[in-house]
Curated annotation (Swiss-Prot):
Domain t-SNARE coiled-coil homology: 194-256
Organism: Aplysia californica (California sea hare)
Name of the protein: Syntaxin
Extracellular side: 289-290
Pfam families: SNARE, Syntaxin
Biological classification of the source: Eukaryota, Metazoa, Spiralia, Lophotrochozoa, Mollusca
Amino acid sequence: MTKDRLAALKAAQSDDDDNDDVAVTVDSSGFMEEFFEQVDEIREMIDKIASNVDEVKKKHSAILSAPQTDDKMKEELEELMSEIKKNANKVRAKLKVIEQNIEQEEHTNKSSADLRIRKTQHATLSRKFVEVMNDYNACQIDYRERCKGRIKRQLAITGKTTTNEELEDMIESGNPAIFTQGIIMETQQANETLADIEARHNDIMKLETSIRDLHDMFMDMAMLVESQGEMIDRIEYNVEQAVDYIETAKMDTKKAVKYQSKARRKKIMILVCLAILIIILVGVIGGTLG
């Protein structure tokens, strides 16, 4: 039965809030205490990114549903995106430092229990970070497609029909004026429609810049998590083995209790039989003597 690796990791973790810390016996040395403070800090930053991504999704929907461009809302969206980028770079830098420290120690103390703990924590945090950033990337791409759809509908209102390929060419040109060529702006509504088209085009341009900015970091992290796949597999295997061992132990305990109960009942029955036999013998002997 195939199990999700992350689910297997979570099954082995002890944090009650988000199950991100693998349950292990930790050395109480100052070094490990400092390490786990770093882990908590990184986790909080990843959680903050995830929260901001949820807010970005809400802003996307609000902007697209608004009849006219809301500059304040777009400023708030840009602030969220800027904060996500800043925190993502911080998380990546901190994970990189942990990774480098692990690589250095592997050459001197490969069997260290502390080292194994740090490798597991690093792998868990890296995977969670990639999942959050992948969600962010997906929401940006989704917003781009929705912006394209709105541009296409607005162009249709002005009487200009375009294919998806033509629309992509217009967007990639980076020149919003291309959208308005040949369109006569005789009414206020037409002006508003064209302004909305240009606003959506600008949104797409900013999105593509954001995606490019995070692309290299995202690919670097994704490759790191993929390279950790073998270690994650080993963790999953160990977790499953531990679960199987516990279940087997439970079954053995139940069997032992059952067998012990049966043995106790047999012992009582034998004692009762012996008592009855003794009473009969005493009666027989007493009758004979009488």
